[in-house]
Amino acid sequence: MDDYSLLIDLHKRGHRQGPGGDAETELALNLALVDRKAGLNIADIGCGTGASTLLLARLLPASHITAVDFLPDFLDVLNREAERGAVADRISALACSMDNLPFADEALDVLWSEGAIYNIGFEKGVAGWRRFLKPGGLLVVSEITWLTDVRPTELQKHWDGEYPEIDLASAKIRVLEKHGYTPTGFFVLPEHCWLDEYYRPLQARFDDFLKRNGNSEEAREIVAAEQREIDLYERYKAHISYGVYLARRLD
């Protein structure tokens, strides 16, 4: 199994593929003053196995959500969970790239994306996705964000290599303004969204993942890389988190 397939194998068994939390997803809805009784057309971009999609479907019973992910394996999990949770009629799974979305212009009331926009870059994402939103439509994205203006060298070097577009919230808000949005809210994901919701469940899967893949060198390298990221977060969590950005498309 190649590294890409191994990563899918490790992460498709997780409820989340990145930091987040149900309370934080609902907080974003509340801050945006979303009418829960309205029939909204929503896209959840980079949905993974569906943590946010499934919650949105429960909280917004009159709405329809198109759950977009590049990986059919993740969408298979989402579809099974949607059936189990009796919300399958509110969700359509779509396997495609987030930089080649098939939506018509001004088709969406809400465009949601938790922990995924980094795959194409924050600026490219918010600029390219804007046309899919109706005037006044809601954008909610979470993005890896510096919490301090000065960071330890080890942390800075790691993220410069992983995601050079990482920046302070003030810079991200300016990007939203530059590309035709009115920012309406922002908050930082708390520590439990990293540890309890993502890293601890991920660590709990390491042993089974290694056994399932014959304790191969490739599998061990993936586990080691994941553990290095966890260690880095725990050491420097005062300097970094995901920020949740809320904005409305200008007319």
Model-derived features with residue positions:
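Class I SAM-dependent methyltransferase SAM/SAH-binding core
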Residues: A43, T49-N100
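Short, glycine-/aromatic-enriched active-site segment of Class I SAM-dependent methyltransferases
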Residues: I144-Y163
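Conserved Class I S-adenosyl-L-methionine
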Residues: F187-D251
